[in-house]
Every structure is written in structure tokens, then in C-alpha cells.
């Protein structure tokens, strides 16, 4: 789910 704080995908997808 990406990086904490991004919720959906963030940086890591």
C-alpha cells in the first residue's frame, strides 16, 4: 500500500 501516509499506493505502489 505504498508509504504510510499515502494510503492508496504512495511511492512503492
UniProtKB/Swiss-Prot annotation:
Q: Which UniProt keywords apply?
A: Antiviral protein, Immunity, Innate immunity, Secreted
How would you summarize where this protein is expressed among tissues?
Hemolymph.
Localization (cell): Secreted
Kindly indicate whether the keyword NADP belongs to this entry.
no
Question: Induced by what?
Answer: By bacterial infection.
- What Gene Ontology cellular-component terms does the record carry? extracellular region
Its main subcellular localisation, reduced to a broad class, is: secreted
GO BP annotations of the record are: innate immune response; regulation of defense response to virus
Describe the subunit structure: Monomer.
**Other observations noted:** Stimulates antiviral and antitumoral resistance when injected in mice. Enhances natural cytotoxicity of blood and spleen lymphocytes. Induces interferon production in mouse and human.
In UniProt terms, what function does this protein have? Antimicrobial peptide presumably with antiparasitic, antiviral and/or antitumoral activities.
Which protein are we looking at?
A: Alloferon-1
Amino acid at each position: 500500500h505504498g508509504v504510510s501516509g499515502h494510503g492508496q499506493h504512495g511511492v512503492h505502489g
